[in-house]
UniProtKB/Swiss-Prot annotation:
GO BP: 3,4-dihydroxybenzoate biosynthetic process; amino acid biosynthetic process; aromatic amino acid family biosynthetic process; chorismate biosynthetic process
Leading EC class: lyase
Gene: aroD
Signal peptide boundaries: none
Protein's UniProt name: 3-dehydroquinate dehydratase
GO molecular function terms attached to this record: 3-dehydroquinate dehydratase activity
């Protein structure tokens, strides 16, 4: 299986990489939070742009991206607008969503973008091609905050992302029971062993699913999300605790 290298970070080998989400509402808070995050132990900075209030002003969005790039130049920067239908803060049109991601790609300020699988097949394929033309990696994602589908469906979605040339397919699902967590882990393992030719990221959310955020190296998930301050999704634990557990499992 091939790995994905962003800056000096190799994703898809060794212990799962830690992603943290920054969710500031304006440029001043982007700056102050970036300074606070700089001291934390993580691998990838995800900027959750759906929390940014001045979204209609692309110049303002890119000014904030520039602050993040300058504050943490060594950290890979993942640009993510999470749609309302997949658990994000704001709803925008598909056209606006694609335009925002295109602006991020063209800016040269971001290393990776998050593209939601169910945005529309043609739009997703075009955005992936655009990203790759600018040497920007694509995390293609799907989130369900209500349920966990059958393992076959989980695998089908991850394989579809792979077929759309995503660099890293990602899926996050809400368990209604502990057996749902096992379904997610079994699907991850089957995907990793039988179909994946690149790193994947999977997680089961909430307290019930916490084990999935810790056991990625065992089952085949290449990265996990931790919290520096406020968690961006239910079930995230602090980056310090996360690094400790990931290291213990890696060295065992």
């Amino acid at each position: 299986m091939k790995t994905v290298t962003v800056k000096d970070l190799v994703i898809g080998t060794g212990a799962p990489k830690i992603i943290v989400s920054l969710m500031a509402k304006d440029i001043a808070r982007v700056k102050s939070e970036a300074l606070a995050y700089r001291e934390a132990d993580f691998d990838i900075l995800e900027w959750r742009v759906d929390h940014f209030a001045d979204l209609s002003n692309v110049e303002s969005v890119m000014a904030a991206a520039k602050i993040l790039r300058e504050t943490m130049p060594e950290k890979p920067l993942l640009f993510t607008f999470r749609s309302a239908k997949e658990g994000g803060e704001q709803a925008i049109s598909t056209e606006a969503y694609i335009a925002l991601n295109r602006a991020a790609i063209d800016s040269g300020l971001v290393d990776m973008i998050d593209l939601e699988l169910f945005t529309g097949d043609d739009q997703v394929k075009e955005a992936v091609a655009c990203a790759h033309a600018h040497d920007v990696k694509v995390v293609m994602s799907n989130h369900d905050f209500h349920k966990t589908p059958e393992a076959e469906e989980i695998i089908a979605r991850l394989r579809k992302m792979q077929s759309f040339n995503a660099d890293i397919p990602k899926i996050a699902l809400m368990p209604q029971s502990t057996s749902d967590v096992l379904t997610l882990l079994a699907a991850t393992l089957e995907m990793q062993e039988q179909y994946a030719d690149r790193p994947i990221i999977t997680m089961s959310m909430a307290k019930t699913g916490v084990i999935s955020r810790l056991a990625g190296e065992v089952f085949g998930s290449a990265a996990t999300f931790g919290a520096v301050k406020k968690a961006s999704a239910p079930g995230q634990i602090s980056v310090n605790d996360l690094r400790t557990v990931l290291t213990i499992l890696h060295q065992a």
